[in-house]
Every structure is written in C-alpha cells, then in structure tokens.
UniProtKB/Swiss-Prot annotation:
Subunit and interaction comment: Component of the large ribosomal subunit (LSU). Mature yeast ribosomes consist of a small (40S) and a large (60S) subunit. The 40S small subunit contains 1 molecule of ribosomal RNA (18S rRNA) and 33 different proteins (encoded by 57 genes). The large 60S subunit contains 3 rRNA molecules (25S, 5.8S and 5S rRNA) and 46 different proteins (encoded by 81 genes). eL19 lies in close proximity to the binding site for eukaryotic initiation factor eIF4G.
SMART domains noted in UniProt: Ribosomal_L19e
Alphabetical list of Pfam families matching this protein: Ribosomal_L19e, Ribosomal_L19e_C
Listed name of the protein: Large ribosomal subunit protein eL19A
Gene behind this protein: RPL19A
Miscellaneous information on this protein: Present with 97700 molecules/cell in log phase SD medium.
Keyword check for Cytoplasm: yes
Domain of life: Eukaryota
Described function: Component of the ribosome, a large ribonucleoprotein complex responsible for the synthesis of proteins in the cell. The small ribosomal subunit (SSU) binds messenger RNAs (mRNAs) and translates the encoded message by selecting cognate aminoacyl-transfer RNA (tRNA) molecules. The large subunit (LSU) contains the ribosomal catalytic site termed the peptidyl transferase center (PTC), which catalyzes the formation of peptide bonds, thereby polymerizing the amino acids delivered by tRNAs into a polypeptide chain.
Length: 189
C-alpha cells in the first residue's frame, strides 16, 4: 500500500475541504500515488477517483425540541439557573419595559381624544412615580377618573341650574313685591 498522505493533502486543498472529507478510491491507489501535482489531482477529481465526501448531518431537531419546551416554561427551575435574578433579567429593564407600555398607552389615548392633555400630564407623572403596576390598572384609573369628572360636571350643571332657578324666583318675587308696593302707593294717592 502506497503512502498517499501528500495526495490527500493536495486533494483537500484542491477540492476546498478538510482532509477527512476527501475519499481516495482504494482500487486506484497506484494511479493516485503517481499524481504528484495539483493538476494531476484535479484530473483524478474530475474522473471520480478522488471524491469529496458529503457533509455529515448534524440534526437540530433535539435543539428545537428543547427550545420549544423552554418556551413552554420547562428547564427553568432553580437547578438550571446560574446568574442572580438581577443578572438574568435586570429590574431596570423590567421598569423600562413597563413604563414604555404605560406611556405608549397614554399617548394613544391622548391622540385618540379619550383623555385631554391635562389628564394625560397628570397620569404621565403618576406613572413615572410608580402609581400603576400594569396597563390594566392605568386603564381602570382612566375610566374611574373620567366617570368622576362626568359626575362632577353633572353636579355642577345641576347646581348652576338650581342657582338660575332660585335667582329667577327671587327676581319674580321682587317684581311682585314692587308691583304690590306701586299698587298700594297708587291707592294711597
């Protein structure tokens, strides 16, 4: 058996793969041993005496299955954790995400006309001050604030109507009294 180490090295270089990916035909060892140049190796590659081996399959199915189960919440117990809670998900990042969600909601509501700019400003400051734990809490607060404003407006309108009614009654009474006085003065005269 001839030593074909050089031919294997040359073939790997010509084909453009590693030495372990080159197959030399064991029936043609004498012919391969004669090839001592890259050109000769190219000819052997062309006629199929030297062949580039296929890429070995490295399946990702197990990795995909593991990733899927991680998405479902598996493999995440205390035994699997290396970093601290803060290292795994910094509280700063959690805070930023939460605040961005709240601010986005406020801007959307303001642009849609669901809240006016004054209420927007108040709620913006409150959310910065950690008044709302999540989006639902903010939405509920907005609904409550709008209901309170509506109730207050209705009460104010009611009070204003009562004031106008009382003023009209006072005016009518004063007019009646003035008419009676005029009538009495006319009778006396």
């Amino acid at each position: 058996m001839a030593n074909l180490r050089t031919q294997k090295r040359l073939a790997a270089s010509v084909v453009g793969v590693g030495k372990r990916k080159v197959w030399l035909d064991p029936n043609e060892t004498s012919e391969i041993a004669q090839a001592n140049s890259r050109n000769a190796i190219r000819k052997l590659v062309k006629n199929g005496t030297i062949v580039k081996k296929a890429v070995t399959v490295h399946s990702k199915s197990r990795t995909r299955a593991h990733a899927q189960s991680k998405r479902e919440g598996r493999h995440s117990g205390y035994g699997k954790r290396k970093g601290t809670r803060e290292a795994r998900l910094p509280s700063q990042v959690v805070w930023i995400r939460r605040l961005r969600v709240l601010r986005r909601l406020l801007a959307k509501y303001r642009d849609a006309g669901k809240i006016d700019k004054h209420l927007y400003h108040v709620l913006y400051k409150e959310s910065k001050g950690n008044a709302f734990k999540h989006k639902r809490a903010l939405v509920e607060h907005i609904i409550q604030a709008k209901a309170d404003a509506q109730r207050e407006k209705a009460l104010n309108e009611e009070a204003e109507a009562r004031r106008l009614k009382n003023r009209a009654a006072r005016d009518r009474r004063a007019q009646r009294v003035a008419e009676k006085r005029d009538a009495l003065l006319k009778e006396d005269a």
